[in-house]
Amino acid sequence: MSNTFPALRRFLSSSIAQGLLILLLPFSMATLVVAGADLTRMERIAATRYGPDAAASVRDWRAMLEASIGSDDHVRLARINNFFNRRIRFDEDTRIWQQSDFWATPLETLSRAAGDCEDFAIAKYASLMLIGIPARQLRLIYVRARIGGADSKLSQAHMVVGYFPTPEAEPLILDNLIGEVRPASRRPDL
């Protein structure tokens, strides 16, 4: 956890400072500062509800978000995609939540260290928003993912995050099936 956050929180205690901070800082930093208190609260909730491993996961998530500030968009996309792909194990909702379909919050996904494709996508989408990528550049996209190899005809419903650098641009795809963030045209499996 950053040592600058306690000082920032004290500074942010006045409404004048809050207004100035939001006007003077880039949107991404302002977003993370505002979210900082919520992430601190999430860490406490994770510790209380799910234990110390879950709290550590939230701390690591926060550190990754802080490290992403100031990076270019491609670095931020890759960092967030890799963070969740390495930390979260894919599993079905019926095994994790004993429900046929459950869309978990990032806290729930990190706390269980498991999720299905929607949980990966929601956590990545929320993370990108927390570091200042506007919602107008992001989409949760349902696709059919080809499974079983290159020649397979089998497919299943799947969710990914699409990042649109400009409104007309081809989206870059963040996915739990393939670690590399690629343009949609380089994802023939979807």
Where are these regions (language model features)?
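A structural boundary/capping signal
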Residues: 2-5, 9, 27-190
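N-terminal Sec-pathway targeting helices
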Residues: 10-15
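Bacterial N-terminal signal peptides
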Residues: 17-30
